[in-house]
Amino acid sequence: MRNKGFTLIELLVVIAIIGIISSVVLASLNYARKKARDAERLSDMRQMQIALEFYHDSFDAYPDSDNAGCGGWDSSGNGTFITPLVSNNFLPKHLQDPVVNDSCGNLAYYRYPPGYAGCSASNGYFYVLGIRDLETSGNPYRSSPGWNCPGRNWQDEFDWVTGSFQ
């Protein structure tokens, strides 16, 4: 006469299958979270570009970099990313990287003087705005506009980068 119920081996097989399925689900959820954070970063960059153009239209210049560390770049790690855009109401709040890995963050802005890195001095000041590390993409990100001068290619330093002359 056979006892009703599951054997130990049957239970172990079921537990192993559940473990495998749950690890696959968790891995795909983690990737989805990374893609969502990258989408937020790219959206922030689009907002930032629009705010920079509004600032330029109002003041006939792009805002200065704060040069407060991070290699002189104005960066998103300290919560004061491009303060003039917020203080002049071109952005509702400071944009910050969704995952701050260090005091610099992944978002960066710098305004360069005319003629820097071999760019034509007649074009005037210019800014570079970029994302250093997208979680789901290598360098460069497929839709990165890119930015370079004869003496420097910022796309080599960022996953996504853009810029504009004043």
Where are each of the predicted segments found?
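Extracellular/periplasmic head regions of type IV pilus-like filament subunits
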Residues: E53-D133
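Generic N-terminal leader/processing signal
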Residues: M1-R2, R33, A39, P140
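Short, surface-exposed interaction loops/tails
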Residues: S120-Q166
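N-terminal single-pass transmembrane signal-anchor helix
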Residues: R2-L29
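Exposed, low-complexity/repetitive linear segments and helix-based recognition motifs
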Residues: K35, H94, N153-D156
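Short, flexible coil/turn micro-motifs enriched in small/turn-prone residues
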Residues: L11-V14, I18, R33, Y55, ...
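A generic fold-level signal
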Residues: N3, E40, A121-G124
